[in-house]
Structures are given as structure tokens and as C-alpha cells.
């Protein structure tokens, strides 16, 4: 009885049918990138902000002040670099403290000795000068409420984490396609609610839910793509779909620049997900998943459809396909750590996901601290990631998965450590080394997706990838706090932490089995055999080397 991989080779491993499905699902990567980094523009700091008191409000109306005049006459001088974004005041002049009973002049400080009015902390009635409206001005996320802006990104990553557990499990139990479609619908609905949220609480709740569904759509589409093509094509589709994520990062600044409000940006992020519901008629359920669920006839129907579109034909020899699993069981967390090889892979992959998220997001946010044009800087940061994908495509088939995976982490780690100790007087060298670190961690982030999906058996693949990548979401939750809290102690301290994490990760991933050119494992036993067979081969090579040297 033929296996699924044999039937897929007969139907075409990457023919016209797979290319069409692949291209359509890759678009999910663009919209997920919008969601993943959209807070940079949704929560962009206003150019200036300050607060009004009762007398300042009356004076502004009577004297017809411009925003700049009100800023200069009612708030204390702010000594910060002119190029720094988000200049603002958390205090105002207490104009009500003057003893005069007459109306203040349009230069209210003349009523105070030495033009020195007392200061008081702001408590509301904020004013903003900004090119585009943002959630900062919408919900007054400044001064004592500034931490709430960090919460908006943390809650999104928490949603990603919840989606990894819940929808990853659901996709393995109920099917890839149905969970993908539900997730896309959820991203659209919750995104619209976020755009028109009447208050911050509603905004946060539905942003969390959008994170849940966003993660479900992204991870499920990635698994569908890797399961519908042959083993030789998995490296290409696994990396190219990451390039579409980078494409989303490159496109987003243009959308944000030409969209005058944060609500418009939020709708641009969310509404395209409704279009993915049309995939119900063109994207099939994963036939590999159907076989593991004892639905071989449905899988054969899809394979015949694939073969017809690819100009192939499945003979009567393929009327049945082998179901590898004697017993089909629902996935469990314990399955990921029950056996030695699965346990080792799971723990290393979790650490790799965590490291990739912390270092990647940390380096991205650190670039934002240097000021400059937000839109251009963000666009350039996206372009830096493209060579990483090309380097992966050139190396992983020649060198395997482990060596590029380890090298990219080590390059990122060493670059962070070197940058931390380079003197400020040679900015070109610091920028060059930092860019090399960004390139390295981008490659590591993209390779971990591919390796994770190749190391887990079919019955656990979606659940396993989702669970391990949950550590990526956990890293995303703590990355902003790790960066800014450590930078307050010493600006370069976060780079040292990032460097240590990435370097350690580079060593650990060398302990993973090599997956170059192998068939996707169908069962846990396949994974155990994969690890033990490679260990045995390694031992035989060492033995041969010893005997040769003795001769």
C-alpha cells in the first residue's frame, strides 16, 4: 500500500496547484506583519503634548493662541534634544496661584515674580500637536499613563500566546482549514471593534482577541503550506513565506504615512483578513492531516484534484494510502516531552523561539531610540531582512538546517556583544555591526519556523509548532520591559543580554537532528528513529576516523 509521500510525488510535489495555494496563503504573512508591528504607528508619540489648567483654557480662547504659543506660555521649558520624538510635559504652570484679581494678560507669566510660576502635575485636559492621530492622543497614554502603551503590545503578544495553545490544538484536532478560516474572520471582526473602541478597556480586550486569532491564522497557514508540498520544496516555501512577512514590514510605513488616523491604520491592518474567507473555495484541507484522522478517502479526492491541476494522473494503485498511525489520538502537551528525542527537541526549540523574539524585537525597538524619520527608518529596517531570506535559501540545502541555524544565532550574539563595547566615536562601525546582528537574528527567526515544522510528527505538528512558538510570544511580552529597564541602568546592557542569549542558542541548536532532505515524520516513533539514526551515523564516522589514524 503506497504512502502519502509516494502519492504526493505521483500527483506532483510542487506543481501548479501547490504554487497557487502557496501564493494565496503567503498573503497571510503580509497581514500578520501588519498586526505584529502595527503598534509602532498606532502608538506613535505626538510631536508635542501638554495639559491645560482652567485659566490656560480661558486665556487660549481669549487670546486666540496658536498651539505653539500655548505650549510656550503655559508649560515650562523642556530641555531635550530637538530631534527626539514625543517631546511633552507632565507638569504645567499653576496660573491659578497668582494673587491678582484682574484677568491675566496674554503673557500670563508677567503676573509672577521673575516670571516664575509654581508647577503642578498634569491631571487631564491634554493637548497634542501631531501629524497623524494615534492611540496615545486618543486615550491620553502619556506621563503617568505611558505604561498603558506598553500594555497594548504586551496584551497582543499575550493573545498570540493564547492563540498558540488554543487554536494550535484545535487545528490538530478539527482541521487546518476550518481553524484558518475562523481565525481570519476573527482577525477582521476584532480589528474593526478595536478601530472603533469607545474606551481603552474595550481597545485592550479586543486587541487581545485579535492577537489570538492572528496567531491562529499565521501558524495554521504555515503548516498547511509545509504539509501540501514535497520534502524538497519545504525549504523554499518555509523561507519564502517569511519573506512575505518582511514584505508586510516594508509596506506598512507607506500605509501609515498616507493614512491620517490610527483608526484608518487599524482598519487597513484588519479588513484584508475578510478576503481570506474566499480561500474556502480554493485552498483544500491538508490531505496529510486527513490521513492521520482516518479520512483517507477525502485525502485521495484532494490528491486527485492536485494531480489533475498539475497535469498528472493517480493510477488505481493509489486507491488507498497508508495510515501510519494504528491509533489516532488527540494531541497532548505530554506527547512533546514523553520520549527523549521529542523532549530534547521541544526544550531546545522553545529556547530558540524565546531568544529569537527577545533579540529581534529588542534590536528593532532599540533602533527606534536613536530618533530620525520613523517611516524611513522602519522601511530600511525591513529591507535589511531581505538578504537574510536569500542567504537561507542559498545555504540550508547545501549545508543543512543546523549549521546556518547555529551560525546565524552566533553572528547575532557576537555582533550584539561587540556593538556594546564599541566607542561612540565610530558610529559607522557601530551601525555596520548592529546591522549584521539584525541580519543574523532575522535568519535565526526564519529558520526556527522551518526546523520546528520539520521535526514534529503530523499528529503533533500544528500543536507542537504553536506551543513552541508560544515562547516567542512570551519573549515578545517581556522584550520591551527588558530593553527599557536595563537601558535605564546602562544603555548597552540590553545588548550584552541579547548577545549572551543568542550565543548560547547557537550552541544548543547543534544538538538538534538534521532534517535536510528527509520525509516529514508521521509519528513520534519516526522522530525518535531520526535522532538515534543520526547519532549512530556520527558514532560510526568517529570510529572510522580513529581506525584510519591508527593505520
Curated annotation (Swiss-Prot):
<dbReference type="GO" id="GO:0043025">
    <property type="term" value="C:neuronal cell body"/>
</dbReference>
<feature type="glycosylation site" description="N-linked (GlcNAc...) asparagine">
    <location>
        <position position="114"/>
    </location>
</feature>
<feature type="glycosylation site" description="N-linked (GlcNAc...) asparagine">
    <location>
        <position position="72"/>
    </location>
</feature>
<dbReference type="GO" id="GO:0015844">
    <property type="term" value="P:monoamine transport"/>
</dbReference>
<feature type="transmembrane region" description="Helical">
    <location>
        <begin position="21"/>
        <end position="41"/>
    </location>
</feature>
<feature type="glycosylation site" description="N-linked (GlcNAc...) asparagine">
    <location>
        <position position="317"/>
    </location>
</feature>
<keyword id="KW-0812">Transmembrane</keyword>
<feature type="transmembrane region" description="Helical">
    <location>
        <begin position="464"/>
        <end position="484"/>
    </location>
</feature>
<feature type="glycosylation site" description="N-linked (GlcNAc...) asparagine">
    <location>
        <position position="99"/>
    </location>
</feature>
<keyword id="KW-1133">Transmembrane helix</keyword>
<dbReference type="GO" id="GO:0015848">
    <property type="term" value="P:spermidine transport"/>
</dbReference>
<feature type="transmembrane region" description="Helical">
    <location>
        <begin position="376"/>
        <end position="396"/>
    </location>
</feature>
<dbReference type="GO" id="GO:0042908">
    <property type="term" value="P:xenobiotic transport"/>
</dbReference>
<dbReference type="GO" id="GO:0051625">
    <property type="term" value="P:epinephrine uptake"/>
</dbReference>
<dbReference type="InterPro" id="IPR005828">
    <property type="entry name" value="MFS_sugar_transport-like"/>
</dbReference>
<dbReference type="GO" id="GO:0015606">
    <property type="term" value="F:spermidine transmembrane transporter activity"/>
</dbReference>
<dbReference type="GO" id="GO:0006837">
    <property type="term" value="P:serotonin transport"/>
</dbReference>
<dbReference type="GO" id="GO:0019534">
    <property type="term" value="F:toxin transmembrane transporter activity"/>
</dbReference>
<dbReference type="GO" id="GO:0015651">
    <property type="term" value="F:quaternary ammonium group transmembrane transporter activity"/>
</dbReference>
<keyword id="KW-0406">Ion transport</keyword>
<dbReference type="GO" id="GO:0015101">
    <property type="term" value="F:organic cation transmembrane transporter activity"/>
</dbReference>
<feature type="glycosylation site" description="N-linked (GlcNAc...) asparagine">
    <location>
        <position position="199"/>
    </location>
</feature>
<dbReference type="GO" id="GO:0015695">
    <property type="term" value="P:organic cation transport"/>
</dbReference>
<feature type="short sequence motif" description="Proline-rich sequence">
    <location>
        <begin position="284"/>
        <end position="288"/>
    </location>
</feature>
<dbReference type="GO" id="GO:0012505">
    <property type="term" value="C:endomembrane system"/>
</dbReference>
<keyword id="KW-0325">Glycoprotein</keyword>
<dbReference type="InterPro" id="IPR020846">
    <property type="entry name" value="MFS_dom"/>
</dbReference>
<dbReference type="GO" id="GO:0048241">
    <property type="term" value="P:epinephrine transport"/>
</dbReference>
<protein>
    <recommendedName>
        <fullName>Solute carrier family 22 member 3</fullName>
    </recommendedName>
</protein>
<dbReference type="GO" id="GO:0015718">
    <property type="term" value="P:monocarboxylic acid transport"/>
</dbReference>
<dbReference type="GO" id="GO:0005640">
    <property type="term" value="C:nuclear outer membrane"/>
</dbReference>
<dbReference type="GO" id="GO:0006836">
    <property type="term" value="P:neurotransmitter transport"/>
</dbReference>
<dbReference type="GO" id="GO:0051649">
    <property type="term" value="P:establishment of localization in cell"/>
</dbReference>
<feature type="transmembrane region" description="Helical">
    <location>
        <begin position="236"/>
        <end position="256"/>
    </location>
</feature>
<dbReference type="InterPro" id="IPR005829">
    <property type="entry name" value="Sugar_transporter_CS"/>
</dbReference>
<dbReference type="GO" id="GO:0032098">
    <property type="term" value="P:regulation of appetite"/>
</dbReference>
<keyword id="KW-0472">Membrane</keyword>
<keyword id="KW-0496">Mitochondrion</keyword>
<feature type="transmembrane region" description="Helical">
    <location>
        <begin position="177"/>
        <end position="197"/>
    </location>
</feature>
<dbReference type="GO" id="GO:0016324">
    <property type="term" value="C:apical plasma membrane"/>
</dbReference>
<dbReference type="GO" id="GO:0005326">
    <property type="term" value="F:neurotransmitter transmembrane transporter activity"/>
</dbReference>
<dbReference type="GO" id="GO:0051615">
    <property type="term" value="P:histamine uptake"/>
</dbReference>
Amino acid at each position: 500500500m503506497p504512502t502519502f509521500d509516494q502519492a504526493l510525488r505521483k500527483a506532483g510535489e510542487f506543481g501548479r496547484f501547490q504554487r497557487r495555494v502557496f501564493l494565496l496563503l503567503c498573503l497571510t504573512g503580509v497581514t500578520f506583519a501588519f498586526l505584529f508591528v502595527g503598534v509602532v504607528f498606532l502608538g506613535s508619540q505626538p510631536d508635542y503634548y501638554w495639559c491645560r489648567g482652567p485659566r490656560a483654557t480661558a486665556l487660549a480662547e481669549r487670546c486666540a493662541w496658536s498651539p505653539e504659543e500655548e505650549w510656550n506660555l503655559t508649560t515650562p521649558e523642556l530641555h531635550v534634544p530637538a530631534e527626539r520624538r514625543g517631546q511633552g510635559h507632565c507638569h504645567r504652570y499653576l496660573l491659578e496661584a497668582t494673587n491678582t484679581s484682574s484677568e491675566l494678560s496674554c503673557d500670563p507669566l508677567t503676573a509672577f515674580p521673575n516670571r516664575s510660576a509654581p508647577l503642578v502635575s498634569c491631571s487631564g485636559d491634554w493637548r497634542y500637536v501631531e501629524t497623524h492621530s494615534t492611540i496615545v492622543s486618543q486615550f491620553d497614554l502619556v506621563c503617568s499613563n505611558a505604561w498603558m502603551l506598553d500594555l497594548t503590545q504586551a496584551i497582543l503578544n499575550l493573545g498570540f500566546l493564547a492563540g498558540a495553545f488554543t487554536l494550535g490544538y484545535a487545528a490538530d484536532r478539527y482541521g487546518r482549514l476550518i481553524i484558518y478560516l475562523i481565525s481570519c474572520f476573527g482577525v477582521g471582526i476584532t480589528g474593526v471593534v478595536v478601530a472603533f473602541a469607545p474606551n481603552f478597556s474595550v481597545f485592550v480586550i479586543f486587541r487581545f482577541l485579535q492577537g489570538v486569532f492572528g496567531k491562529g491564522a499565521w501558524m495554521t497557514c504555515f503548516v498547511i503550506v509545509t504539509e501540501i508540498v514535497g520534502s524538497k520544496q519545504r525549504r523554499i516555501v518555509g523561507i519564502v513565506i517569511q519573506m512575505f512577512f518582511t514584505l508586510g514590514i516594508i509596506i506598512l510605513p507607506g500605509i501609515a504615512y498616507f493614512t491620517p488616523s490610527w483608526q484608518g491604520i487599524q482598519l487597513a491592518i484588519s479588513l484584508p483578513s475578510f478576503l481570506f474567507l474566499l480561500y474556502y473555495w480554493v485552498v483544500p484541507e491538508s490531505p496529510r492531516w486527513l490521513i492521520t484522522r482516518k479520512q483517507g478517502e477525502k485525502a485521495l479526492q484532494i490528491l486527485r484534484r492536485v494531480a489533475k491541476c498539475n497535469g498528472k494522473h493517480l493510477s488505481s494503485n493509489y486507491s488507498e494510502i497508508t495510515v501510519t498511525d494504528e491509533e489516532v489520538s488527540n494531541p497532548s502537551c505530554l506527547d512533546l516531552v514523553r520520549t527523549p528525542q521529542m523532549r530534547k527537541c521541544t526544550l531546545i526549540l522553545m529556547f530558540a523561539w524565546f531568544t529569537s523574539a527577545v533579540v529581534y524585537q529588542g534590536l528593532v525597538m532599540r533602533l527606534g531610540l536613536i530618533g530620525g524619520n520613523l517611516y524611513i527608518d522602519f522601511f530600511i529596517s525591513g529591507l535589511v531582512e531581505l538578504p537574510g531570506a536569500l542567504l537561507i535559501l542559498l545555504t540550508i540545502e547545501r549545508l543543512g538546517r543546523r549549521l546556518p541555524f547555529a551560525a546565524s544565532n552566533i553572528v547575532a550574539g557576537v555582533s550584539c556583544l561587540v556593538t556594546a563595547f564599541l566607542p561612540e566615536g565610530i558610529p559607522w562601525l557601530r551601525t555596520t555591526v548592529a546591522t549584521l546582528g539584525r541580519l543574523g537574528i532575522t535568519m535565526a527567526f526564519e529558520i526556527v519556523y522551518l526546523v520546528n515544522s520539520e521535526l514534529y510528527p503530523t499528529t503533533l505538528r500544528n500543536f507542537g509548532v504553536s506551543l513552541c512558538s508560544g515562547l516567542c510570544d512570551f519573549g515578545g511580552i517581556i522584550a520591551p520591559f527588558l530593553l527599557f529597564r536595563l537601558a535605564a541602568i546602562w544603555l548597552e546592557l540590553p545588548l550584552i543580554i541579547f548577545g549572551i542569549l543568542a550565543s548560547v542558542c547557537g550552541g544548543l541548536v547543534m544538538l538538534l537532528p538534521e532534517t535536510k532532505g528527509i520525509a516529514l515524520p508521521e509519528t513520534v516513533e519516526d522522530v525518535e528513529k531520526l535522532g538515534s539514526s543520526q547519532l549512530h551515523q556520527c558514532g560510526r564516522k568517529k570510529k572510522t576516523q580513529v581506525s584510519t589514524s591508527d593505520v
